[in-house]
Amino acid sequence: MNVVNESPRRKELIRQAAQLFVQEGFDRTTVRMLAHEMGIKSGSLFHHFRDKQEILAAVIEEGTYNALTLARQALAECGDSPNERLHAMARAHLETLLTDRNAHVVALYEWRSLDAKAREHLSHLRDAYEELWERVIDEALAAGLIEGDRFLVSRFVMGALNWTVRWYDPEGVHKPEDLARELVSMMVSSAAT
């Protein structure tokens, strides 16, 4: 199962499905609703996807793949200091959340709706993303930049970042860069006291 596909039409269908899954929830979304939202007949949907599960997997895979790609790029382009790397990861995560919001919300709240085969297939992407965070947090811990248990620190950081999809206003005064800077500042300040 490799649901990442470069077809522009398929990408648009995935984007529309993500929006509908966020609005209605995966369980309440029917194939007929998806087809209507996408402007196609129900049967035509199966030209692109085997079933609704594959659509969900495609939404989550594309969102997670994009997050992983952006995070790797941010780390490759930032400096070597733990502070810069922590900031780059936070900024990349926020940019992913805020530019690909629906796919991320679906990944956060509908992971449990994936069947076992899809979860197994997608776990490598999620694990790779979490490993990047753990590595950056380990570097910050080793440098004394932050303190705490790596598992707990990573869960608190991810939770704080992920919650921004609920309250952040892209039209507001704060930009993703501001949020990333503030998060890292709070983490570093708490270790200094």
Put a short name on every predicted segment.
Residues 10-11, 31, 53, 57, ...:
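Short, structured helix-loop boundary elements
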Residues 12, 16, 20-54, 58:
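Helix-turn-helix
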Residues 23-24, 78, 100, 143:
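Short coil/turn segments at alpha/beta junctions that flank glycine-rich nucleotide-binding fingerprints
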Residues 26-27, 146, 174:
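Conserved hydrophobic residue
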Residues 58, 73-102, 153-157:
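Hydrophobic alpha-helical connector segments
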Residues 62-72, 117-142, 151-155, 178-181:
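Amphipathic alpha-helical packing segments from all-alpha helical-bundle domains
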Residues 92-95, 99, 130-139, 158-160, ...:
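C-terminal peripheral helix-coil segments that are non-catalytic and often amphipathic
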Residues 98-117, 166:
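Amphipathic alpha-helical segments used for helix-helix packing
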